[in-house]
Amino acid sequence: MWYQKTLTLSAKSRGFHLVTDEILNQLADMPRVNIGLLHLLLQHTSASLTLNENCDPTVRHDMERFFLRTVPDNGNYEHDYEGADDMPSHIKSSMLGTSLVLPVHKGRIQTGTWQGIWLGEHRIHGGSRRIIATLQGE
């Protein structure tokens, strides 16, 4: 059985955001599978998806500070005509990735107790973000 749906995440400020509930709420009509895989593909080149700490928001703040130091906006980038935050956003997106594959068991994603799905919004004004969710299972 295959199922696919386009999800839209609301616009977020620059930084890392816990979006597990926002994604799962949009997948409420997803067919229930006993065992399967859920693939999430973020359709953007200046944001990222990753799994990380879902409880303490300071982890997200520390992650953002790390990436701002590691890939600064004021770098000497050739690709700069879309703004000072654009090229660093592409780099961060490539470092973290834009897709996740999550196991599904009895209709629920099987993340660890402390794991949540994060959106890394790397633009100052990124806007809404689209995710293609594809479920395969039985």
UniProtKB/Swiss-Prot annotation:
Coiled coil: none
Superkingdom of origin: Bacteria
Cysteine disulfide partners in this protein: none
InterPro entries assigned to the protein according to its UniProt record, in alphabetical order: UPF0047_YjbQ-like (IPR001602), YjbQ-like_sf (IPR035917)
PROSITE patterns found in the cross-reference section: UPF0047
Family classification: Belongs to the UPF0047 family.
PANTHER family in the record: UNCHARACTERIZED PROTEIN YJBQ-RELATED, UPF0047 PROTEIN C4A8.02C
Protein's name in the database: UPF0047 protein YjbQ
